[in-house]
Amino acid sequence: MPSRRRTLLKVIILGDSGVGKTSLMNQYVNKKFSNQYKATIGADFLTKEVQFEDRLFTLQIWDTAGQERFQSLGVAFYRGADCCVLVYDVNSAKSFEDLNNWREEFLIQASPSDPENFPFVVIGNKIDVDGGSSRVVSEKKARAWCASKGNIPYYETSAKVGTNVEDAFLCITTNAMKSGEEEEMYLPDTIDVGTSNPQRSTGCEC
């Protein structure tokens, strides 16, 4: 039987503490939301199997701490990323202003081979808060920033009710595929365990 090819895509979610990174990840992977806030310590990740254009993908989504004292963990967690998601809270001007710092931090720590074309996606989260009346960062302003950084795709979401979360992660998956850095895992449908007396190699045929 033919083997199935599964591609591992590593996605990093960055942004200030409290913008909803963990909630976005849980809403997408588990379709769950909790009102109880618990800061991520260091980093955590979830995986989700995705079928796209007749290909099977495993998304490995890393949720990293937003506190500055954990930024030194960046090198270990950022390396090998296929897409970086920058998240801010539309009700927090500071979280939006800090996007540039997070972007620069990622590029320094991850050292992608082609930083000019590395795929980012920006998410403005918590559009549901107070029915939108608490919003301080306009969609126009956010889109202008994304345009200035090479036309980064932009989505506005509510991790609480799920608004645009699926669409955002579809874009994230698509952009991660284009990065060309994916690690492929081959999953044989059958494993032959009946081979006996294997021949030993006595040399290297290079």
Curated annotation (Swiss-Prot):
Keywords: Cell membrane, GTP-binding, Lipoprotein, Membrane, Methylation, Nucleotide-binding, Prenylation, Protein transport, Transport. InterPro entries: P-loop_NTPase, Small_GTP-bd, Small_GTPase. SMART domains: RAB, RAN, RAS, RHO. It is a lipid-anchor. One of its GO terms (cellular component) is plant-type vacuole. The modification Cysteine methyl ester is found at C206. It is found in: Cell membrane. A motif (Effector region) lies at residues 37-45. It holds the Pfam family Ras. GO terms for biological process: protein transport; response to oxidative stress; response to salt stress. It comes from the Eukaryota. GTP binds at residues 15-22, 63-67, 125-128, 158-159. Induction: By hydrogen peroxide and infection with an incompatible race of P.syringae and B.cinerea. One of its GO terms (molecular function) is GTP binding. A lipid is attached at C204, C206 (S-geranylgeranyl cysteine). Intracellular vesicle trafficking and protein transport. May play a role in adaptation to stress by recylcing macromolecules in specific cellular compartments. PANTHER family: RAB FAMILY (PTHR47981), RAS-RELATED PROTEIN RABG3E (PTHR47981:SF26). Belongs to the small GTPase superfamily. Rab family. This is Ras-related protein RABG3e. It comes from Arabidopsis thaliana (Mouse-ear cress).
